Design a protein with these regions (language model features):
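Membrane-anchoring hydrophobic helices of lipid-metabolizing enzymes
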Residues: 2-129, 174
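Proline-centered loop/turn at the N-terminus of a beta-strand
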Residues: 21, 124, 149, 199, ...
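Conserved phosphate-coordination/catalytic loops
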Residues: 21, 106-109, 180-184, 223, ...
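Non-catalytic C-terminal accessory region of glycerolipid acyltransferases
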Residues: 53, 144, 173, 184-297
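Short, flexible loop segments at the rims of nucleotide/cofactor-binding pockets, characterized by
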Residues: 101-107, 176-181, 219-220, 267
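Conserved beta-strand termini and adjacent loop/short-helix elements that scaffold enzyme active sites
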Residues: 110, 153-155, 180, 258-260, ...
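Catalytic core of membrane glycerolipid acyltransferases/transacylases, capturing the structured
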Residues: 121-182, 210-212, 217
Length: 297
C-alpha cells in the first residue's frame, strides 16, 4: 500500500510513516484521469498482495480480532483483508479530496450540533480522535461546513518527498497541521488556535516508547495511552469532544461527536471517558482499526 504505519507488528508505535512516492504518483494519476472507481479496482490488487506478503501487520490484526475482540478465525481473516482494503481506500479518498473531488462523497454527521455549539461559545474546541476510520477526510469535511479553520496535531512523519509531491499535485490540505516538536512550540500553536476560536484535533490513541502515558483497561486488557493529549484537553479552557469519522459506504462517511466536556477535569478522567468511547467505535467498526502494532503491552 502507499502508506504504512511504522513498526508494524512491534510493541509500540515508533512515530514513523513509510510511503512510496511512486505509489502516490500512480494513484493520483488514476484518480485524476480515470476516476475513483478505477483507483479502487487497482487497490484490490494492491491490498491482496499486501495481505499475502505483509506478515507482521497481518499477524497483529489477526491477534487483535481473535484474542481481543473474540472473533472466530475465519471471520478474523476476512476482517484483516477488508481492513487492508478500507485503509487503502482512506488514502485514495484523502487524495481525491485534495484533488477537488469532494462532491463524489456523501456523509452523515451524528450530533453535528455539538460542534456548532462549541463554535458559538467562542473558545475554540479540542477534538480528540483515534486512528480508526479517516480523520483527515473528516477534517476536510468539517472545514467550511462548521468552522473556517481546523488544525490537526500530528507527528510530521511523512516522507518529505511524498509530502512535497502531495502539496505540489493537489494544492495541499484544507486544514492546518500543527507538528509536534521537541521544543513544545506546538503547545503555543494550539493555544493561539483556540484563542482564535479554531478547532484543534488530536489523535489520542498511540503511545510511543519513552513518552508519558496512562495505563487503562481497553477491550478487557491493559493498554498504554499517551497522556499528552489529555493534559492539553485538561489544561486549556476550551470544550472537549471525541470525534470519529468511519467509512460506511463506498463513497460515504459517518461522522460522530460526543457531548462536549465543559467542566474542569483531570487528564486521567478525560482519558477514561475517551477510552470508553473508543471501545464502542472499535466494536462498531472493527475493520477500520488502523493500528498495525501490538497495542497491548
Amino acid at each position: 500500500m502507499s502508506r504504512q504505519d511504522g513498526n508494524a507488528g512491534g510493541n509500540s508505535w515508533n512515530g514513523k510513516t513509510r510511503g512510496s512516492l511512486t505509489g502516490y504518483k500512480i494513484f493520483l494519476f488514476f484518480i485524476q484521469f480515470l476516476g475513483l472507481g478505477f483507483a479502487y479496482l487497482l487497490l484490490r490488487i494492491v491490498t491482496f498482495y499486501y495481505y499475502l506478503f505483509a506478515a507482521k501487520p497481518r499477524i497483529v490484526l489477526l491477534d487483535f480480532y481473535h484474542n481481543t475482540l473474540q472473533i472466530s478465525g475465519k471471520t478474523a481473516r476476512k476482517l484483516v483483508r477488508r481492513n487492508f482494503y478500507i485503509f487503502g481506500q482512506t488514502l485514495v479518498d484523502r487524495a481525491a479530496f485534495l484533488l477537488g473531488k469532494d462532491k463524489e462523497f456523501t456523509h452523515t454527521f451524528e450530533n453535528e450540533e455539538y460542534l456548532i455549539d462549541i463554535r458559538e461559545k467562542g473558545k475554540g474546541g479540542i477534538l480528540l480522535s483515534a486512528h480508526l476510520g479517516n480523520w483527515e477526510t473528516a477534517g476536510n469535511l468539517l472545514k467550511g461546513r462548521i468552522t473556517p479553520t481546523i488544525n490537526i496535531v500530528m507527528l510530521d512523519a511523512e516522507v518529505e518527498s511524498i509530502k512535497q509531491y502531495m502539496e505540489l499535485s493537489t494544492g495541499g490540505s484544507r486544514f492546518k497541521i500543527i507538528a509536534i516538536k521537541n521544543d513544545l512550540s506546538h503547545i503555543i500553536a494550539i493555544r493561539n488556535a483556540l484563542i482564535n476560536n479554531e478547532f484543534v484535533a488530536i489523535h489520542a490513541d498511540r503511545y510511543m516508547e519513552g513518552a508519558k502515558f496512562t495505563e487503562l483497561d481497553f477491550l478487557g486488557k491493559k493498554a498504554k495511552f499517551p497522556i499528552g493529549p489529555f493534559i492539553i484537553a485538561s489544561k486549556f479552557d476550551a470544550p472537549v469532544t471525541f470525534v470519529f469519522a468511519a467509512k460506511d459506504g463506498k463513497y460515504s462517511y459517518h461522522l460522530s461527536a460526543t457531548l462536549p466536556i465543559t467542566t474542569k477535569m483531570k487528564p486521567e478522567e478525560i482519558a477514561k471517558l475517551y477510552v470508553a468511547e473508543l471501545e464502542k467505535k472499535v466494536r462498531q467498526y472493527p475493520e477500520q482499526w488502523f493500528n498495525y502494532f501490538n497495542f497491548f503491552q
